[in-house]
């Protein structure tokens, strides 16, 4: 592993980084040598055995009640939407009925195999609160503001649709009593005024659909740049956010504390928006499809979406996104 200089640690992890590095040094995990802090290679274990890079808490184990064997696992952040009670879980072509999702230090989903044409699709309610803003970039005409910082994402799976194959025919909806879960992580987001949305040709009734579609497409394209997966990211789009009082699109890391993906997106926003605009524009569908603006993880059933509005918005953002300029750190203005 490369050494971590203290000045770089402060710029990435904040002013508390030196104290944390010193504490890790006292515990014998790190050593300080010329060039910065390094992993203590004399330790019996490597860092990959001690630290889960993709988050904390481990995966939720899925146990077949008939055999007692573990058939698979799902990440903590997606367990509520994949293995909630009465969900139909598909694993390697086999279908399982979820009997229960047990809470505790180790979360376990108990399932039994069934043969059924039924499928389930969870719906959720998500809210996001801005905790701090670390960097800001303003377009030269002041029409778009980009930010990077810390956010709290609160999500609750509220209900699920029961569907039938083929065609995923809707059968019924069932309410769920699932807990709210809050994730503190890193995000990047942009804001623009309703007047700007109107000026670039987006009808008032299509504003939310345009923002929502742009969010989906952006999340689908960022993994091509940031070396991650769509499931490593989350997002929220709204035509009036409580912390910005403006139409806003957020893209956040799906792991506690962040994993650097949203930070990368902020630093390379121009290329990110160019790639996203190109993907949406080149897709031959008319109203949107899984290739461009529909998301397999959308908690709102991919509604509302406006492909026309997304193309207008993304095309505008190509010329209103950070690229080679150095974004303004808020600490530089104090």
Segment roles from a protein language model:
Residues 7-8, 292:
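Short, solvent-exposed helix-loop connector elements
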Residues 283, 288-292:
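Short cysteine clusters
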Residues 35-41, 108-110:
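Short, structured interface segments
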């Amino acid at each position: 592993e490369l050494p971590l200089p203290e000045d770089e640690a402060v710029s990435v992890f904040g002013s508390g980084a030196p104290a944390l590095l010193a504490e890790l040094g006292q515990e014998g995990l790190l050593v300080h040598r010329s060039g910065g802090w390094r992993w203590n290679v004399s330790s019996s274990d490597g860092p990959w055995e001690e630290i889960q890079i993709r988050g904390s808490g481990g995966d939720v184990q899925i146990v077949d009640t008939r055999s007692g064997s573990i058939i698979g696992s799902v990440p903590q952040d997606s367990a509520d939407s994949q293995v909630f009670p009465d969900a139909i879980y598909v694993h390697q072509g086999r279908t399982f009925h979820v009997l229960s999702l047990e809470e505790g230090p180790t979360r376990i989903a108990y399932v039994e195999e069934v043969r059924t044409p039924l499928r389930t699709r969870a719906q959720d309610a998500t809210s996001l609160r801005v905790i701090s803003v670390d960097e800001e970039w303003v377009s030269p005409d002041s029409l778009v503001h980009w930010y990077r910082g810390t956010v709290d994402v609160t999500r609750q799976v509220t209900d699920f649709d029961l569907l039938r194959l083929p065609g995923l025919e809707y059968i019924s909806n069932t309410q769920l009593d699932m807990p709210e879960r809050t994730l503190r992580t890193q995000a990047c987001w942009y804001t623009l005024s309703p007047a700007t949305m109107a000026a670039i040709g987006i009808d008032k009734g299509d504003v939310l659909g345009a923002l929502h579609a742009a969010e989906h497409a952006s999340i689908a394209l960022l993994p091509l740049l940031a070396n991650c997966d769509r499931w490593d990211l989350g997002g929220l789009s709204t035509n009036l956010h409580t912390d910005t009082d403006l139409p806003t699109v957020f893209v956040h890391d799906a792991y506690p504390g962040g994993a650097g993906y949203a930070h990368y997106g902020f630093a390379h926003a121009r290329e990110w928006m160019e790639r996203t605009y190109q993907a949406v524009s080149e897709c031959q569908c008319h109203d949107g499809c899984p290739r461009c603006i529909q998301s397999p993880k959308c908690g709102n059933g991919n509604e509302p979406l406006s492909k026309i509005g997304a193309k207008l918005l993304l095309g505008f953002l190509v010329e209103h996104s950070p690229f080679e300029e150095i974004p303004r750190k808020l600490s530089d203005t104090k």
